[in-house]
């Protein structure tokens, strides 16, 4: 027999000791709950308040800083925003009746405990957020962070996470169109699994999360409610992983992607039938969150009967039903006259649905179970009146030492530079992610235009017009550790640039802010700086933050992760047929591996002048195993002008690739390998005077040109006949740019090679032929040659060697 702690019991036994500490509540928070209720809470009320007031649900440590996004968002920035911060996901009007919704969410802590299910349900949760906006989910992306690649625990976690992301997304029929995978010691024991979903809808189909209209019915539909995931996200995300703590953690949710696939189609049918007043997905905090948020956002209260909830387990108490985080569930508000039609559509899709209550007068959420009242509280106090902490923040004492300029030991010889190019390409930081991305279906549904080896994923959303979107997610914890404000703006700049190089126009931003414990003043300083940097950057660029997520307590014991603000940028493109590819085109009839039979192109570096900016760089990490100095400067006005120039010139640009981690060296290596073409590049050209210091050897100067990570730079491939016009147009923008190399370079045997040399100059004036000037070649020049085969082997071999035999999918419990 089920025994619930009822409201009557709470009044009759006011001094009953309750385990509020175990549920993550502090003494003052528990006292505040009793003050709001005028009595002690019931077990069910205590469960609801504990999850709704958790860090994950209430944003109690971050809310005071997140308000800055609203303060810096202008009316012009809001003009195309149909839904923003506070909704399940942001929605942007992109014209012609089309809208796009997108959001990034974290599922970090569950993915360490149970990598496969943690990652899978992270994808499922963000997909349901998109569904709840009235949209069809059309693509996913993932931002992953792990400990060192050769660490045994990484070899347990990574395969499970990748299998979970791929298994769930592939089963849903959603293409995975991009992301990032990063390795760093601070993520050992606390991986980051951030998932993005993007959806499309007609503007008139937008749905919001609110319960409105007295007498309207509340319908729970989808999978049954079970014991899996009780307290999962909401409690896990409010604690740190100390040694041995994983044994105490509650179960991670278990996902069923095929149930979610049916749920997607069911929801879309319900929207088409116009039988939904408001809708909310059940994610973190389960039915507690869905009912409290729906009621709080609406114009009334709510009466719920838990006896009508379809259960997977017998004997579940009210607190367990309300706290369950079982997946693939939604909660809708429906007018009484539409209930039959709603249920009929659910039966059509074989989706369980039950009428669990109604919208009432007032603001109270009343919940009954087994004929007894177990919850009687203001929904607003649960959803909106949680504690808001003004956590102390302070610049860490070690920050000055961390930022001190360090003398960099540059390579002395050409051979050292050559080896470092290969070392960077082969490093876990920069090597090919093909081992991971090949486990994802990138082209399901047939609308993926770019995903493999692309700076941004490009998706067609209208087959008649070719209209499309481009999405990129970026972050650099290394930059943010050195300067969180600049680090956040560099992530924004790179995501913006990645979208721009496809020929798309950036229009909106989402974010997922991953940090250590908010109880550490140094972490809160990092967080505040990153938020202000991102908000100020978005205001300067005129693109709004439409929503996001905060994940705190990402640390193992006292060791916090690198501050990791993940930034997603959404762009629109009027015709996907005109998008700019990242690879050179394959020429019909050209022989594989023979560059002489391929059309040649000029390589042009445009944007900012290359400066000596090696602080926080991948070169510093791989060659010197160090994190020190200052990150690159960022000028967002240059980024905007660069993006506008590329979009304007897209018909003259054959291929474009942004320069970011690894600098010019990695950009050329990737472009050459992905295009299957040889290339010759002069790293001395287009450098700022700071990068060509007096007294340095040619090898040292070349190293700065190759490995510096100066922001706002893009490598373009241009036909000879378009070069002059493009350069004249570039001069009018005030941007720096110039010839830096050419494609179609091979060795004496005709095999493609990558050549970096100070003697690489074109024959002038530019004519129909693209060739190097032999008069510029000297014996004492800096000159190195790497065969394309050698570069490709270095770039592609690392992850398979590390992970192809890893066990994966293992739980620590």
Swiss-Prot record:
Residues involved in substrate binding: 106-109, 128, 253, 325-327, 551
Chain positions recorded as Mg(2+) 1 binding sites: 105, 549
Active-site feature positions: 56, 107 (proton acceptor)
Intracellular or extracellular location(s): Cytoplasm
Reaction it catalyzes: N(2)-formyl-N(1)-(5-phospho-beta-D-ribosyl)glycinamide + L-glutamine + ATP + H2O = 2-formamido-N(1)-(5-O-phospho-beta-D-ribosyl)acetamidine + L-glutamate + ADP + phosphate + H(+)
HAMAP family: PurL_2 (MF_00420)
Full protein name: Phosphoribosylformylglycinamidine synthase subunit PurL
Native organism: Corynebacterium jeikeium (strain K411)
Phylogenetic classification of the source organism: Bacteria, Bacillati, Actinomycetota, Actinomycetes, Mycobacteriales
Gene: purL
